[in-house]
Structures are given as C-alpha cells and as structure tokens.
A protein has these predicted regions:
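Short amphipathic alpha-helices and their capping/turn segments at secondary-structure boundaries
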Residues: 30-44, 163-172
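Active-site catalytic loop in hydrolytic enzyme cores
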Residues: 70-75, 97-201, 268-271
Length: 290
C-alpha cells in the first residue's frame, strides 16, 4: 500500500488503445513495452491499458494458459514491474487465485510494486458476451492510494452498473480509471456507434455526479467477429471532456489532470459533503429484507 505523500498537483495521464493478439501474451507484452517507451518520452506519469490488454478478449479455453500473477518472479510481470519504476501503469490481464479460479483483472503498478489489483465484479453473459462461463466473479470494489491521490479501477461492465462507481466515490477515489474491451454495437446513420455514445454519456455523468476525474481506455481491432472501437476519454470533476482519442485505430491519448480542480469544483458543488450515506445503507437494508 502506498504510504508516501502526494507530491504533484498535475498528473500527466496517457490512455493506450491497442489491438491485441489473442492468447499471445509475449507478443502483447512487447507491444506494452513499446507503448511504455513512447509514453515515457512524453513525460507521462500514468499509462492506462485496456481490459485484458495482455491476453485478448475472447479467450474461452485459453483462459488458464493466459493467466499470470503480478509479482516479481512472473515471466511477464517482471518486465512490467521493472518498467513501473519510471512510470505508473494500469494493465489488463487474467489473474489466478490460490484455488485456481480465474478473474478478469486490472493491476496498478508503481515503483516496481503492485499497488492494487481489481477483479471484475460484473461479468456480462448475454448477447455477444460469454464471460460468466469462463471467469469467476470479483467480490470487492475498493479505492487505493497512489502518489497522485486516491484512485479506483473498474472494468467495462462494472461501470454499466451505478453501484461500483458510487462505492469507489464513497471509499475516497478522486480519480476513477475505467478500462474496457467494448465491442461496437448499434451502428446506424449516426457517426458514432451506440455503444460509444452510451459509454461517453455515462462516464461524463459519473465525473459530474461524483465531482471526480474519470478516464476510460478501450481497446481497438477485431477479434473473433467482434469490433472494438477505442475512443479513449478523460472527463474532469465538472464533467467537461479534456481528452478524446480517435475511433477504430491504435493510439495513445495524452491529457494533463489539474488535481486542484477537485477543490475548486467541490467548494462550489458540495455533493460529496452532503451525501447521506447512512440513509443509503438504511434503505438498502430495508430493501434487502423484503
């Protein structure tokens, strides 16, 4: 757990929207290291990769062989942990617990250490999606401390539900990092895919309602008939868009977060101060007892 004080009020954030090779973790690692090198040359503090960025998405029977642990002696993570001595990283991978359950996971790496791991808590198993057949459900939503302040991570379907971002907000997260492997759906006569419009609307809304920074990194490319659209975004605590990546192509989207904006916004709009958490808990208990 990070215990040092925050030493920067500006955070240079980069979002990497990459294509991945399904099941080829070593090839995907090489791409990560290349993007890390690019981001370092731009003085980036934190580089965020998409959901399952080390493995690809439609893994199915490749899940077990693609799993890795975010520890020093792991053949993949040792390189990423070493890279994190110079730049903080969020990477997507398949995690495995001591009883051989497999999770869709994001790891926050900093200073050569794993600071936090989030296991995806909502696994879509409908329509195009089949995650519940192959993965275990995460059971925690926790914020964590970094050298830039307190953050939280969610993965795709997690933020299609209102409760995980709300829990992160109450747990002290001022910067929310969302990562996705979001396939395109709802193409019509408008410029944007409906899935892209929906994600951008909801991330903007979370930033506004929770007076927090919200960043979203989504992968690109095609995999097993699915098309991933990219379109990275960053919103400030006023809900204003401060960065937007291109659609349908690999890119790094750079932004600078002025962390003083948290104070300015919350002094004017004290939604966090006035949040009645005890009321929420009491009403949830009543509803659950029905």
């Amino acid at each position: 757990v990070f215990s040092g004080k925050i030493h920067k009020m500006k955070l240079n954030l980069a979002l990497a929207q990459i294509n991945t090779k399904l099941g080829d973790v070593e090839a995907n690692l090489a791409k990560h290291l290349d993007y890390i090198k690019q981001a370092k040359s731009e003085k980036t503090d934190l580089l965020v990769f998409p959901e399952l960025s080390l493995t690809g998405y439609v893994l199915q029977d490749l899940v077990a062989s693609a799993a890795h642990k975010p520890v020093d002696d792991d053949p993949i993570f040792k390189h990423l942990l070493n890279a994190s001595k110079d730049i903080d990283l969020v990477v997507g991978f398949v995690d495995e617990d001591s009883r051989h359950r497999f999770f869709i996971a994001s790891a926050y790496l900093s200073g050569g250490k794993t600071i936090h791991v989030h296991h995806k808590v909502y696994l879509p198993t409908y329509g195009l999606f089949d995650e519940g057949r192959f993965f275990a459900w995460g059971d925690r939503v926790r914020a964590f401390d970094t050298r830039f302040g307190r953050m939280g991570m969610l993965i795709c379907e997690d933020f299609w539900h209102a409760s995980p971002p709300y829990l992160l907000w109450l747990d002290g997260a001022d910067i929310m990092i969302f990562s996705s492997a979001s396939p395109g759906r709802g193409l019509n006569d408008k410029e944007k895919l409906e899935s892209a419009r929906w994600v951008e609307r909801v991330t903007k809304a979370y930033a506004s309602m929770f007076t927090s920074f919200v960043a979203h990194s989504n992968r690109v490319g095609y995999e097993d008939g699915l098309h991933f659209w990219g379109g990275a975004t960053v919103f400030d605590p006023n809900g204003e868009e401060i960065a937007h990546g291109p659609y349908n192509e690999e890119a790094i989207t750079y932004s600078q977060l002025d962390l003083n904006q948290l104070r300015r916004t919350r002094a004017r709009l004290p939604l966090l101060r006035d949040e009645r958490t005890n009321l929420t808990v009491a009403e949830l208990q009543r509803i659950l007892q029905k």
